[in-house]
Structures are given as C-alpha cells and as structure tokens.
Regions:
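Interfacial segments of multi-pass membrane proteins
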Residues: 127-130, 337-352, 357-363
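N-terminal signal-anchor module of multipass membrane proteins
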Residues: 32-113, 121-129
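Membrane-embedded helical hairpins/re-entrant loop segments and their flanking transmembrane helices
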Residues: 47, 73-111, 278-349, 468-472
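Membrane-embedded alpha-helical modules
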Residues: 129-249, 356, 360-465
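Short, non-helical or kinked segments that cap or interrupt transmembrane helices
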Residues: 107-120, 162-169, 224-230, 328-337, ...
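Intrinsically disordered, low-complexity non-transmembrane regions of multi-pass membrane transporters
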Residues: 12, 19, 24-53, 248-260, ...
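Hydrophobic, membrane-embedded alpha-helices of multi-pass small-molecule transporters
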Residues: 48-65, 198-210, 227-228, 243, ...
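Hydrophobic transmembrane alpha-helices of multi-pass solute/ion transporters
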Residues: 32-44, 215-216, 229-277, 430-438, ...
Length: 473
C-alpha cells in the first residue's frame, strides 16, 4: 500500500501508485521515490515469512481454481471420483505453471509475481463442448488451441505486442479490475448459487475482513502489515464459526493421498472445437499482457520488458499444453493474486513460487487442499474485492502516466465504453456465437476496440503539437 506522503508545491503534484510515490512536475516529467513497505520483486524473505506470506496467495488461488473442475465435471455429468481426478490435475497444473512463470526456465517465464491458474473463461465452452462431443474432444481442442496460440504469439511477438501501447494496456487492466469486482461482490454475498446468498451476515463478514485488513495494512508495522490478509482471514473465520458459517467436515472426509492421472479421459480431435478454443486461448493471452503490466507496476513501477512479456506468454502457452494433458482447461493469470501483492506490499516472486510448490503438493494431498478451501466465501470476497480494486487503480495509473493526446483519449474512452458496456449487458450479444460474444465484451472487447481504433485513427501533426503544448504549460 502507498504510504501517506503529500508533497505540496506549486510546480508539482503527487501521484500515488502502488508502493511508490510518483511526483510529476508541470512539464509532465516523473520522479519516482520508492517507499520500502514490503519485499520487492527479487527479494527472498526468510523462510518463516515466506511460508506465512505464501499462505495468503495459496488461499486466494485455491478458491479461484477449485470451482473450475467442479463446474465442468458437474456440467457434463461426471461421477464424483472422475471430478476428483479433474481437481487433482487442476491443482498440479496451477502449481507447476506458477513455478514456471515466477522462477522461469531459460527464455520461459516472466519472472514476475504471477500465479497461473486454470481459467474460468473455458468453463462454459468446456461444459458445452464436453456435453456435445465428449471430454476427450474438448481435451484435444485445448491441446491444439494452446499449441497454435503459443506458436503464433512466439513467432509474431514483436508485431503483436507493438499494438499494445501503454494506454491500451492500461485500459485492459482497468476493465479487468472492473469486471472482476462483480466476482468479488458475489463472493462477499456468499458465492454464486449459495442458499444463503445475500445474507446480511455474509456481507458483515466481508466488511469485517476488509476493515481488519486495511487497518493492519495502514497502521500495522512489519509483519502485521505484510500478513494483513492472512490475519484478517484467520480472525474472521473464527468469528464466522459463531454464526455457523464455517464447515470443517470436508477436511475429515477427504483422503490423504491421490495421484493425478494424465489423459484419463483420452484425447480426440475435431476441427470445430479446436477453432473455438484457439480463439479463447488468444483472448487469455491478451488478459495475461494486462496482468503482466499490473504485476510490473505494483512491484517495480514500470511496464514489463519485451523479454518478460515474451517469457510470460511462453510460460502460459506451455502450461496450457501441460494442463490439457491432465484433461483440464488452459491457464490464465490470477488477477486476484496480483492485487494481493499490491495490498500487502509483498511482491516477491519467490513467495508466489513457494505458493506454487504448496499448491502442487495439494494435488496429491486432498486433505491439505481442504484446509484452504473451507474458508467461507464472504471472507475471501473481502480480500478479493480489495485486491481487484488495486488492479483497477493500477490500470488507471498506467493510463494517467501515458500523457494522452486527443486521439489517444478518444481511443481509450471508446474502448472502455465498449468493453464495460457489453459486459454490463451480456444479453445484447445473445444472438452471437460464443466466441464472438467473448471477443466483444470485457477485456477482449476493450483490447480489440482499442487496437482497431489505433489503426484507423492515424497519428498526425496536430496530436504531436497538442502534446508539446501541454508539456510547455
């Protein structure tokens, strides 16, 4: 969190960004003053602290990934034992992918504090295609789609990333934060489909979590500030037990060990599903680019380098291929985990990589996984909502620091309106096929609109003169 620092000067104004204060003078120049409130990107905390801080990341990640195999399995009518196989594969892939992204291997991996997890984007098509063609065909589509996307993004990385100017990336991150806020509110109310959804007690638990976390973050020193999310979760979980909201029975019911099985349901290829999944894989990588920008901004107040961007894309592509081999969906970056880094100030990639190790272990030890998954949704919602708000603000800061021309302002405004507008009224795209509606709303809609407009609205001398005039004032 940003420390309260105000610089009063006629010629400067203070811009608060993550853990750094950016001082912008009247000519638009930025001076960055780093405020050390946690562990930075390449710092490795002592092992005891690493374990504690990683637990915060594990809790958020497990809550995000567990519903993916559960929803797909239930949607296509799998037995409980078959769903268990999907869950094990999902956790194993999330752990491996996170380690690959944070620690890296050669050119692979962004080496930023990013959790890669099985994506909700693929749940709806997974149910639809799995029910119609079988899970083996869906697995084949995920495998081929991941390979195609990885090859295209690797070969044409420079050309593709050149289209994503900072103001476009900022717009994508901002819409990502806005779209995720609805998920956070849903968790606060009890979780989608919960029998007690909207219960005032749920909202009070969420509010209590937010208040405790922010107070510790604002006034706590050292450990209390950095572990604010974990401490608030523990306190509010104990309080939730008084209201009968904490159910520990699933821990006793789970087995101690299970082994993930690759290609348990077989694999088969069909052109139609392959095309659909390939498009969605491309969309997932657009979202990754936004999350990479957010992670770099929160950890080091900069945009990701070309090497980090390409390495992150390669890590997501390879992990999606591995995920397909375990009959699971392609991976995507965990935005909530990135936001959590911004809240606690612990942006160390080693903390996140340790979380990946534990999540991978959870894939063979269901009882350990159950310990993390019994936390009531409203409490997780309080943490998630705060994290998503951090993502939203980081996107706003990228846009603000871009010193927009009138042309770029138009592009940002229209692209935000399209992405946010369609996501607020999804029924307006009901007549379109799934892949088309996915391209037009939310993050993909914002990115696609911004890219098209940036190609149509060419830069001219008037834009340059306008920007120079603003700088001289």
């Amino acid at each position: 969190m940003t420390c309260p620092l105000y610089i009063c000067s006629e010629n400067t104004k203070t811009v608060h960004v993550g853990r750094t204060v950016s001082v912008r003078n009247r000519k638009g120049a930025h001076n960055m003053s780093k405020i050390n409130t946690g562990y930075s990107l390449n710092e490795c905390p002592p092992i005891k602290e690493t374990i504690i801080y990683s637990i915060q990341q594990i809790i958020v990640a497990v809550f995000n990934v567990i519903p993916v195999p559960l929803l797909i399995g239930a949607g296509i009518g799998l037995s409980s034992s078959e769903i268990t196989i999907l869950v094990a594969g999902c956790l194993l892939v999330t752990g491996i992918a996170t380690i690959l992204q944070t620690i890296g291997m050669g050119p692979v991996g962004a080496r930023l504090p990013i959790v890669l997890e099985c994506s909700f984007v693929f749940v709806a098509p997974g149910i639809a295609l799995g029910s119609k063609y079988g899970l083996n065909v869906y697995t084949g589509a995920c495998l081929v789609g991941s390979v195609i996307t990885l090859i295209l993004w690797t070969l044409f990385h420079k050309a593709l990333t050149k289209m994503f100017k900072p103001y476009i990336t900022g717009s994508v991150v901002m819409v990502l934060g806005i779209s995720l806020c609805s998920t956070g509110i849903s968790y606060c109310a009890g979780g989608s489909g919960a029998t007690d959804f909207g219960d005032p007690v749920n909202l009070l638990l969420a509010a209590g979590t937010i208040v405790i976390m922010l107070l510790l973050n604002r006034y706590g020193k050292g450990f209390l500030s950095k572990a604010s999310a974990l401490i608030s979760i523990v306190i509010m979980s104990a309080i939730s037990a008084l209201f009968g909201k904490l159910d520990l029975s699933s821990i006793a019911n789970e087995k101690w060990f299970r082994i993930p099985e690759p290609l348990h349901f077989g694999i088969k290829f069909d052109l139609g599903p392959i095309v659909t999944i390939s498009i969605l894989c491309f969309i997932a990588l657009v979202e990754l680019m936004g999350d990479q920008a957010s992670a770099a901004m929160l950890s080091e107040q900069r945009l990701p380098s070309a090497k980090e961007s390409k390495g992150g894309i390669m890590a997501q592509g390879i992990s999606s291929i591995i995920s397909s081999m375990f009959n699971m969906v392609p991976t995507i970056s965990g935005s909530a985990n990135i936001g959590l880094c911004g809240i606690t100030g612990v942006t160390s990639r080693y903390v996140v990589s340790f979380a990946g190790v534990v999540i991978a272990i959870c894939s063979i030890c269901p009882k350990l996984c159950a310990v993390f998954s019994v936390i009531p949704y409203p409490i997780l919602g309080g943490v998630a909502l705060t994290a998503f708000g951090t993502i939203l603000v980081s996107g706003m800061n990228v846009i603000r620091n871009s010193e927009l021309t009138s042309r770029e302002t138009t592009i940002v405004g229209v692209s935000l309106a399209v992405g946010i507008g369609f996501s607020m009224v999804p029924d307006s795209l009901a007549a379109f096929p799934f892949w088309a509606s996915s391209l037009l709303s939310g993050v993909p809609g914002t990115a696609l609109t911004a890219i098209i407009l940036s190609l149509l609205l060419k830069e001219d001398k008037m834009d340059d003169d306008t920007q120079k005039g603003d700088e001289e004032e």
